[in-house]
Swiss-Prot record:
EC class (word): hydrolase
Assigned EC number: 3.1.-.-
Function, as annotated: Could be a nuclease involved in processing of the 5'-end of pre-16S rRNA.
Family, as annotated: Belongs to the YqgF nuclease family.
Record's protein name: Putative pre-16S rRNA nuclease
Keyword Protein biosynthesis appears in the UniProt entry: no
One GO CC term on file: cytosol
HAMAP family linked: Nuclease_YqgF (MF_00651)
Length: 142
């Protein structure tokens, strides 16, 4: 059993998908999709701080999109910057970067298999990707 819950994040340029673990550390559930705007430097950090405090979160797992050759591209650099911004606001929270290659594709595939409409998929895809990221991490620590 964990002493704190773990948050999973899928960081994009317009949204951040948010997932949270149970206290056993076995399962990840979709929690929210935050709207952000990188161009205006609005990263939704205040919203995340509130979520973290309200949900007894001790660690945050941020998806790190890597290229297939293991290099880090533009989106990966943006995720690393997001980590630094979050660390400034929450210096006591453990932040883990997790290889998220293909997590959005896996989330999209599972939504397609569940016959979810395109409009509904657009609303939940980032949250689902965060679930895939967090579940991958949780499975690795079991």
């Amino acid at each position: 059993m964990l002493t704190h819950k773990i948050l999973g994040l899928d960081v994009g340029s317009k949204t951040v998908g948010v997932a949270i673990s149970d206290l056993m550390g076995w399962t990840a559930q979709g929690l929210d999709t935050l709207r952000i705007n990188e161009e205006l430097e609005d990263y939704g950090i205040e919203q995340l701080v509130t979520i973290i405090k309200e949900n007894n979160v001790g660690s945050v797992v941020i998806g790190l999109p890597k290229n297939m050759n293991n290099s880090i591209g533009f989106r990966g650099e943006a995720s690393l910057r997001y980590k630094e911004l979050l660390k400034e606001s929450l210096p006591d929270i453990e932040i883990i970067m997790w290889d998220e290659r293909l997590s959005t594709m896996a989330a999209e595939r599972s939504l397609l298999e569940a016959d979810v409409s395109r409009q509904k998929r657009k609303k939940v895809i980032d949250k689902m990707a965060a679930v895939f990221i967090l579940q991958g991490y949780l499975d690795s620590i079991q």
